[in-house]
């Protein structure tokens, strides 16, 4: 990501989880500003995550959850890389509304900081890009991800280094 608009990004890190975060992302969807900002910032999280995911998993038909899918940037990368069976979930309905058609099999709204209404052992893989950061998703969400995954599943996520240290992910 370039430093061009980093000042515009900093308010995200000052938010508290919950309605404040949802409202911020809802506002960010106006005129598709979120996707435009990701391009301007040269955000490579989705591509890098899927590159790592496919390095450790050769099966293209496993059931995957893109947790915190936003506008579908990771889903687009999954599809480009031949994956065929994945769902998307996000906290912001307005972000979900911007996901292109025919990317995900299912889209649903969830709060990753709460127990999610997904059965145990549902998924064989999870991607989670850009959600483990200040004011967003907290460490207990990892326990939920493990719960909804089958044994030996791959969970591939990005994490802001500051939150890794400050919130006790280590």
Protein language model regions, located:
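Short helix-loop-beta connector
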Residues: 57-63
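A short acidic, Gly/Pro-enriched loop at the edge of an enzyme's catalytic core
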Residues: 114-126
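Residues lining the SAM
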Residues: 128-132, 158
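A short glycine-rich, Lys/Arg-flanked "PGG" loop and its adjoining helix->strand segment in the class I
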Residues: 139-151
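Conserved beta-strand signature within the Rossmann-like core of class I S-adenosyl-L-methionine
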Residues: 152-160
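Conserved Class I S-adenosyl-L-methionine
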Residues: 167-170
């Amino acid at each position: 990501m370039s430093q061009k608009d980093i000042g515009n990004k900093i308010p995200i890190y000052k938010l508290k989880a919950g309605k404040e975060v949802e409202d911020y992302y809802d506002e960010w969807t106006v005129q598709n500003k979120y996707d435009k900002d990701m391009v301007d910032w040269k955000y490579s999280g989705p591509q890098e995550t899927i590159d790592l995911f496919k390095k450790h998993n050769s099966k293209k038909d496993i059931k995957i959850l893109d947790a915190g899918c936003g506008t579908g940037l990771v889903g687009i990368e999954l599809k480009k890389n031949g994956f065929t069976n994945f769902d998307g979930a996000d906290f912001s309905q307005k972000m979900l509304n911007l996901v292109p058609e025919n990317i995900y099999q299912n889209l649903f709204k969830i709060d990753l900081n709460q127990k999610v209404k997904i059965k145990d052992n549902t998924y064989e893989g999870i991607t989670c890009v850009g959600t483990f950061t200040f004011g967003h998703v907290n460490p207990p969400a990892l326990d939920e991800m493990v719960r909804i995954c089958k044994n030996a599943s791959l969970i591939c996520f990005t994490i802001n280094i500051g939150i890794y240290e400050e919130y006790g992910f280590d």
